[in-house]
Amino acid sequence: MSKKIYFSTTEIVPFANVSSMAPFSTAVPTILQDLGHDIRTILPKYGFISERKYILREVIRLREIPFSFCGEEEIASAKSAFIPKTRVQVYFLESDEWFQPLNNLLYKSKNGRVLMDNSMRYAYYSKAVLST
């Protein structure tokens, strides 16, 4: 029996590949799709992810979705692409404030220190994912 699955992650090869989570988050959706399930993945749209290289496209129904975070009204939007060499769809959650300034280390600054706002960044991401 086919299931509809929404898979949320912070890394997927080749878009964001920092830890062992990236290959895992690439393999699991691919395997589930090969088993006949309808799977969609969602990932933060980090500033270093090239829209041109990965052919990210606007998703009209995922534009400007309002949600509340820490008592503030926020707006979430997402773009879409596919994991290369698969038909697994990936939604990229956009936020200029939370994801745009990150370098390709994701969780750390260039000097190796863990970013102090990681907990808030991924709390925002989790809330936005549940709202889309």
Regions found by a protein language model. Name each.
Residues 1-18, 43-45:
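Nucleotide-activated donor-dependent transferases that construct or modify glycoconjugates
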Residues 11-24, 50-52:
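A short, glycine/small-residue-rich beta-strand->loop->alpha-helix junction that serves as a flexible
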Residues 21-25, 29, 126:
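Short, highly selective alpha-helical patches that border small-molecule cofactor pockets
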Residues 27-37:
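A short, Lys/Arg-enriched amphipathic alpha-helix followed by its capping loop at the start of a domain
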Residues 37-39, 90:
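Hydrophobic anchor at the start of a short beta-strand
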Residues 45-132:
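A conserved catalytic-core segment of Leloir-type glycosyltransferases
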